[in-house]
Amino acid sequence: MTGVFPGATAGRDVASYTVVGAPLDASTTFQPGARFGPRRVRHLAATYDDYDHHTGAGFTDLAVYDHGDVHPDSDVDGYLSFLRALLSEELDDGRTPLVIGGEHTVSVAGVRAADPDVFVCCDAHLDLRESHRGNPLSHATATYHALEVADRAIVLGARTGSEAEWERAGREDVTVVAPRAVPDWEPPAAVRDGRTYLSVDVDAADPSVAPGTGTMEPFGLASRDLHDAVRAVAPHAVAFDTVEVNDRDDGQSGALAAKLLRAFVYEHAVSG
């Protein structure tokens, strides 16, 4: 591991949250570099104040532990199984996982560990492909695999996908909230009353906000939209990840992901 997430000062035995780096970068289809995401997010989180005026909480008081990175090998399926087992142990011990990717495929491990009723994902892409370029464990299949576990998926900010993906998104177990509608979106009863997994793919943001990601897509969300969505879902979530940050910008994407992770913890701890 390169560094510890700033403010993650708790020991594992007393922690309420566990940061886990998952630097998988196996199926990136345009700009690689997601392997640097965990290191970059940790580094860029160092600029933020401990105190959160929205909740009145200090990050260092919220019992966050940093497990370090779980490094992948060439066996992606085996890696996801190992990561799932680790996250399951954290959940069983009462700690909320905070996964930093890595490509979006790592969400598959998180969802399998958390066994949610609802998968809420901020993403530019539908990620509903059964496989991509012959790979069934591609970053473009994250929501498809989430629906093998969850009863419902809500994709905030999606604006692109294949024809087959849009057809799949038309079924009743998928809700797509267009970027222009996200500022007015509120978590439905399924999120408020069930087990929810929250995933934030940084490419949900407009490229002007977060250019350091594998597959940019214009006309995306403002950083404030993402912040408000994360805070709205956090009290109802059992696990969180932020994914697809790479090293191909001046830090905008990593800084955004770090801020959103912190916002999740503040709101989950105080309102959850």
Placement of each model-derived feature along the sequence:
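Conserved alpha-helical scaffold segments that buttress catalytic/binding sites
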Residues: T2-G272
